[in-house]
């Protein structure tokens, strides 16, 4: 059986991928580039447990994950589907080369904000960014992991009927499952290797 076609029109996947590709040259760098991170990628799946963050940050001094949170309004203009999308970019950093994680996170957050509010930013979007905001997501549990996290949120109109090259997406090879039956009970963990 061959892999079936998957029509992504009407989704925010293309917009997120465009934002990631725009931010990569601005924010990705080597370990000694303290105002940059190791990876900029589209945020997918749950990411609300300390173990998830710790696993993703392993062997990284920092990273940025971009996600669409919601589409607040849809419209058709010239036969195209346009959506007003609320985005978030999470900035993760660790202490590096004697510089604190908190300082690095603030600096990288500032670079991210400056790059998306530039007049020529995100040329494939339908509109300029609006309602840009950044927040320090400090809490004791995250601090114990040795990580600082900031978020940058904004709204922007994007075409939602763009097709994406499915070959550009990560392969869906494994499916991980963690089931919680009740509080303080052992979890059910599993990993399934999917046929390709």
Spans of model-derived segments:
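Oligomerization/assembly interface segments of phage tail-like spikes and tubes
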Residues: 81-96, 146-159
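Acidic-leaning, charged glycine-interspersed low-complexity segments
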Residues: 26, 60-61, 102-165
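Small/polar-rich, solvent-exposed N-terminal microdomains that initiate assembly or binding
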Residues: 1-77, 171, 177-196
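Extended, charge-rich C-terminal regions with high alpha-helical propensity
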Residues: 140-196
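Extracellular/virion structural assembly segments
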Residues: 10-11, 16, 80-84, 92-118
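Short, cysteine-centered beta-strand-loop-beta hairpins and adjacent loop/turn segments enriched
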Residues: 74-76, 94-99, 158-165
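Short, solvent-exposed beta-strand/turn "edge" segments of beta-rich domains on protein surfaces
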Residues: 58, 74-82, 141-147
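A short, terminal or domain-edge coil/loop segment
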Residues: 84-106, 178-196
